[in-house]
Amino acid sequence: MTTDASNNPLLDFSGLPRFDAITAEHVTPAIDHLLEKSYAVVAALEAPTAEVTWDNFVAPLEDASELLGRAWGVVSHLNNVVDTPELRAAYNENQPKMTEFGTAVAQNEALFAKYKALRASAGFDALEPARKRIIDNAIRDFRMGGAELPAEQKERFAAIQEEHAAVSTRFSENVLDATNDYKLTVEDEADLAGLPDDAKQAAKALAEKEGKPGWMFSLHFPSYYPILQFADKRALRETVYRANATKASDLGEVFSKREDWDNTGNIVTLLKLRDEEAKLLGYKNFAEVSLVPKMAKDPEQVIAFLEDLARRARPYAEQDYAELSTFAKDELGIDQLQAWDIPYASEKLQEARYAFSAQEVKQYFPEHKVVDGLFRLISSLFSVTIAPDTAPAWHKDVRFFRIERDGKLLGQFYLDLYARAGKSGGAWMDDARGRRLGANGQLQTPVAYLTCNFTEPAVIDGKVQPSLFTHDEVITLFHEFGHGLHHMLTQVNELGVSGISGVEWDAVELPSQFMENFCWEWEVLSHMTAHAATGATLPRALYDKMLAAKNFQSGMQTLRQVEFSLLDMHLHYDFQPDGAKTVQQVIDEVRAKFSIVIPPAFNRFQNSFGHIFAGGYAAGYYSYKWAEVLSADAYAAFEEAQALGEDAVSETGKRYLREILSVGGSRPALESFTAFRGREPSIDALLRHSGMAA
């Protein structure tokens, strides 16, 4: 095992992470070394001082925390994108140590007292606003971390944090393992009628890789979803739907082999731990705890917001479903729509109504044109240039870029676009390094990870074919890049509130959802399309059809997101984990009250709902819709500017950069939004953009 700190690549902070050298054996020595140093810093800072200042207290604590956080961030990232037994073991060995340290700091009464003393000192008023906000956030976090609890309760609180981290990790691992384990082989090509050629080619390649005949499908989204959307064989759609809807549950395909992959018990454990944590802190429920650092005032406000949105969307959703049911019966011979019919029937209905298909559109979005078009838009909006750069990466398909303005480096990012075994599903942005101005006056620029799970390029007859993106995948890429811009274009020099740091969780989706809107602009799309076979730009007539179909089934889609948000809130607000009611009953009650499309009784989507059980969205999934109000209203400012000409659009872009992206978490999100928009947010733009305006 590598124990020499001087030779451990995970401890090299001189530049970018050395992904070409870091292995699982480096993790424990590096984390132990950094924890030892961090505990020593904390011990030194506990000692009484004549005066508490930023420089003699906050800065050294941030220095130690940042190095530990950066190293652990690399480990966590690798665990998400190149899962191996060795790396997983190293991660699980060290996660409890990290949790223990975080809790020890959060409950340290001496540190807490010093933050409060600094807040009350005469020197506080002389600090710049970003530093004041960091101090206020720290005091809040100490209180929420149990610093004010009596000793016995502190001990229990710490145990809760450690167990919660372990169970949450186990939840994620179960989803990943169940996803990777499932393989469906189809040997008769006739069973794949309706499936696009590129989906069949990918399935053929997977079968060959696994040494199997025919075509093989997995539960990775680019593999299974084309079956639900395009396969004519209803039984095949049902098979794949059941497998995906029951993964990591007692009803899953793999349950007979690995009962420990069932997340049902983990969900209950997590809810119990969160409820106990809330009670220890003096709150009625975990939803109240979750909302302390957010824009929303209380759970009642969130529930009222969601129920109001459901009320507005329901008439449109009912109309959507009635039309789909009639079409399925009359045109497809499906008398009773089932869950595995809805994507298929919806695709057929959209083709019939708007005379185009998602597969037709996909041919115009080869990866290189989409990425180039995205970069072109960013350059135009924010006066920056994006260029390829070099850095060690964790996989051969990962690319690295730099963002500059007037020759000055602003930030860098890794782009990891393709789905693969050992990589967690979904799409996300995370920070590898935050912007910070050091005590020596040297600026540390931000670095981001941008991760998606799109279909990798296919090799046909020895020739590599470009990866083609669906329009939904284009939107996903723009979404994640919006997060990346928030992180990389910040001008705040204090680590705790630069970029995405310190931004309220229900506002952090504003920049990401804002970027999605550009995926519907002709001037943007016309520069990022080229037909895979002919090279032709997206025809204006096809674009017009896409635009006409933009709000296709928006009522159903809105209700689906509201359903997820409400069940998340109710599980953390008025559900009693030790009571007679089960998690499934709560979900069923929410669906009965608000849903138009009720999933089958065997559906266990919650068993892979990583956002709230293995991510940061517990009692916070509503943030997507909450922030969509902000992002739609922000984009409406650009729509208004377009009517006034290019100069107005340019000025609006500069104002958005100045008031939203640049300031990061250095001030409240509502203050930033109001500075940009000139008023508080309105839901009107969201309803209009969704085709649900009154």
Each PLM stretch: what is its role?
Residues 2-33, 80, 87-297, 396-399, ...:
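His/Asp/Glu-rich acidic catalytic environments and adjacent acidic regulatory segments
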Residues 19-31, 53-58, 259-263, 302-309, ...:
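Membrane-entry segments of alpha-helical transmembrane domains in multi-pass membrane proteins
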Residues 456-478:
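Short pre-active-site segment immediately N-terminal to the catalytic Zn-binding motif
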Residues 38, 42-45, 61, 68, ...:
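Amphipathic alpha-helical coiled-coil segments
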Residues 130, 134, 163-169, 173, ...:
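Active-site-proximal, well-structured secondary-structure segments within enzyme catalytic domains
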Residues 66-77, 140, 242, 342-349, ...:
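Short, hydrophobic/amphipathic alpha-helical patches that form generic packing surfaces
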Residues 2-29, 33, 193-194, 369, ...:
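C-terminal, non-catalytic "cap/extension" segments appended to globular domains
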Residues 35-126, 559-571, 575-592, 599, ...:
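C-terminal non-catalytic alpha-helical accessory regions
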